[in-house]
Design a protein with these regions (language model features):
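Flexible, polar/acidic helix-loop-strand segments at domain edges
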Residues: 348-444, 661, 665-676
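Long, intrinsically disordered, low-complexity segments
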Residues: 23, 107-110, 190-192, 272-339, ...
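Short coil/turn linking the two alpha-helices of tandem helical-hairpin repeats
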Residues: 150-151, 157, 229-238, 460
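Bacterial Sec-dependent N-terminal signal peptides
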Residues: 17-43, 191, 224, 453, ...
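Membrane-proximal, proline-rich intrinsically disordered regions
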Residues: 23-67, 72, 352-356, 649-655, ...
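Glycine-rich, aromatic-lined ligand/substrate-binding cores of catalytic
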Residues: 286, 290-398
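Conserved, well-structured interaction surfaces
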Residues: 44-53, 57-58, 84-154, 176-189, ...
């Protein structure tokens, strides 16, 4: 009893650090390392729960997932070269270590925490009813970590008990610690076994105090994601129908289980998908299958803030500077009728006035010149990011201008990523936007719908694939059209529907950290006969290799105004500027609000059209990816499965290197991630 009280009062006075919301301080937990406590914690449900919560804390993804990192810069979403797309080859010496990382903070360290719990929980005095949901949550997180490893490497060592760190007699290759890489198939089998145990032991939903914990539906949805990945071309080069069937069965079961417990597609309608935008900032929504909650607390021991808001906001609004959207992403989004730009007969795409007549989600994904991007202290904050140039030659150079309408600092392209920011975000003079409690949704119900649609197409149920796509588009207000297809081409074959589903995922999940994994599992950087990869040709898409990222500069036409200095004092269009020229078509009175009623919105767009058409030209900024030497995306075939870093092989010489990579001694790797 004394030990129990010490744990309760000194270490875990309040439960659920990883799961708290921003509006309820009652559930704050002090972050403590819970890795070293003995088996007595398993005699009390609260201390055992605290151990589980510590595993959540170690395992939950960060709120800035989907930002500008090596993964997203390898896709169309962000500019710049990444480690995986630059001209120099990644080798065993400089490849990132996603395998062991650090002994205390890598995936196997987290798996060890799960194993320690599962090894010891049955030795305590808890009842079966108390133990079952605790064990089920830990089974989920063990499967989670193994699924990440398998996605990256293929087969990895399967360790299901907490190993003793003492080697004993002999060298490491003869130790019980020397666990070799299992086949990918064996790893998938173990992941599914853990997830089935999680599904069986978890409730379908939790009460408000425990909102954010893993449910049976979440475990089923992860199972569906894992099996869909295993059925995809990365792992399934011969297009084995049995794998698609397993993925279909798992995703159908996940969808049905989630729906039976109150989950589903949240309402995404409203003016230009206003309610869809709210999905990303609402702590409790039917869309959130796997979610990470945050708080607004500033005390280090209790703080769990989401850094996305601060990172995404422009410097003009006191943010860190924002995420710049590429021209490739801006031009990609469908038109208002759901058809691709250039394919719609009702809406003509104008690259200068790229904001006109777009998919409703466009206005919730991007922020551009003249659009209102509110926060709590300034509901009328309007983005202005045009540039001006000192002469004609500078204007046509494809480089940034010499003057900028963003006086506090600019983003690297004239369009911002707005998605996942909170229109009611609170700004403070001391913390700016850093105390954000906006949740991060790791898996939305929309993904379950599209996972099921893709698996349905995989087994030949094309109509079911169409229905999944239609459901996603219908819920954001895209019109069905005369053919009832919501802009989706009719009569597509299997590969054509795969292409449309991947396109829809690119729109629906933009800047959520999904695109890189979709490109990997469909091998969209190249076609390579040496590894039996022809998916780009099959789908009718251009490989991403050989491409460059571009920014959009909205430049003031030289015949209207040229200057060589930046700032308010040199901006002729800003009514607050000392050289404001009211005889020009200026920005006065322009504030395009996506929340406005349709008639008001169209009137606002007309004013913006006049400003753009009179004053601005679109310049493709080709300077954002490296030029010397000239960078073009170069994702090598061997990167589809990463190799082990040399320090891993030095410490664990029994681990075979992946095919395509050199082992520690410089010999070709022999481990085949595709071997059964």
């Amino acid at each position: 009893m004394i030990l129990k009280n010490i744990f309760k009062k000194s270490l875990w006075g309040m439960m659920l650090l990883p799961l708290i919301t921003g509006c309820d301080d009652e559930f704050l937990v002090e972050k403590k390392d819970f890795s070293g406590f003995n088996e007595e914690i398993y005699n009390d449900v609260q201390t055992a729960q605290a151990k589980v919560d510590y595993i959540y804390y170690l395992s939950l993804p960060g709120g800035t997932t989907g930002g500008s990192d090596d993964f997203s810069k390898s896709t169309e979403e962000f500019v710049g070269s990444s480690k995986f797309t630059q001209l120099s080859e990644v080798t065993k010496s400089n490849v990132n270590d996603y395998f062991f990382s650090k002994s205390t903070s890598g995936p196997y360290a987290f798996i060890r925490e799960c194993n320690m719990f599962l090894d010891n929980i049955d030795n305590g005095t808890l009842t079966e009813d108390e133990k079952t949901p605790l064990k089920a949550q830990v089974y989920f997180w063990r499967a989670w970590h193994y699924s990440k490893l398998v996605n990256t490497y293929g087969g990895v060592p399967i360790v299901l008990t907490a190993q003793n760190a003492i080697l004993g007699e002999g060298d490491i290759t003869q130790s019980d610690l020397a666990v070799p890489r299992s086949s990918t198939a064996k790893c998938i089998e173990q992941i599914i076994k853990d997830l089935d145990l999680a599904i069986a032991g978890l409730p379908g939903s939790w009460n408000d105090a425990n909102w954010g914990r893993i449910t049976s539906g979440a475990a089923a949805a992860l199972k569906g994601r894992v099996l869909l990945t295993y059925a995809s071309p990365l792992f399934n080069r011969n297009d084995d129908g049995a794998r698609w069937q397993a993925a279909y069965d798992a995703n159908l079961a996940a969808k049905q289980l989630l729906e039976a417990n109150g989950f589903g597609l949240a309402d995404g309608t409203g003016n230009r998908a206003e309610k869809w935008e709210k999905i990303f900032v609402t702590p409790k929504t039917s869309e959130a299958v796997i979610t990470v909650l945050h708080n607004t607390v500033t005390t280090d021991s209790y703080k769990k803030n989401n850094g996305w808001e601060q990172s995404a906001r422009p410097k003009e609004a006191q943010g860190n500077g924002g995420y710049g959207a590429t021209a490739e992403m801006v031009d990609l989004f469908p038109m208002k009728d759901g058809k691709r730009p250039g394919e719609s007969t009702d809406f003509t795409y104008d690259p200068l006035k790229f904001y006109k007549d777009r998919d409703p989600r466009f206005y919730r994904t991007f922020a551009f010149n003249g659009v209102v991007w509110p926060y709590k202290q300034d509901a009328a904050y309007t983005v202005w990011s045009y540039q001006w140039f000192k002469d004609d030659a500078s204007f046509i150079s494809g480089k940034e201008g010499q003057g900028f309408a963003e006086y506090a600092g600019r983003v690297n392209t004239g369009v911002y990523v707005r998605k996942r920011t909170n229109p009611a975000a609170e700004f403070s003079a001391t913390d700016k936007f850093s105390r954000s409690a906006t949740p991060y949704i790791e898996m939305r119900f929309a993904e379950v719908v599209l996972n099921l649609a893709e698996a349905a197409v995989g087994i030949g149920n094309l109509n079911e694939g169409y229905e999944g796509l239609k459901a996603i588009r219908n819920r954001v207000g895209i019109p069905a059209g005369a053919d009832g297809n919501y802009g989706i081409p009719a009569g597509l074959d299997r590969d054509g529907l795969f292409r449309e589903i991947l396109y829809e995922r690119q729109i629906e999940f933009a800047y959520e950290g999904r695109r890189f994994e979709d490109m990997r599992r469909w091998m969209l950087w190249n076609d390579d006969a040496t590894i039996n990869n022809n998916t780009c040709a099959r789908l009718g898409v251009e490989p991403f290799n050989g491409k460059r990222h571009h920014g959009i500069i909205l430049g003031v036409k030289p015949e209207i105004y040229t200057a060589s200095k930046s700032g308010l004092s040199y901006d002729v269009f800003n009514p607050l500027s000392p050289i404001y020229n009211e005889t020009l078509v200026t920005r006065a009175g322009i504030a395009v609000n996506p929340n406005a009623a349709d008639a008001d919105f169209e009137a606002q767009i007309a004013l913006l059209d006049n400003f753009y058409g009179t004053n601005l030209a679109r310049i493709e900024n080709d300077q954002l990816d490296p030029l010397s030497p000239r960078f073009e995306v170069t994702y090598l075939s061997k990167y589809y499965f990463l190799g082990l870093k040399e320090n891993v092989m030095k410490q664990s010489p029994y681990l075979l290197q992946t095919i395509g990579w050199d082992d520690y001694y410089g010999n070709p790797g022999t481990f085949d991630p595709l071997a059964e």
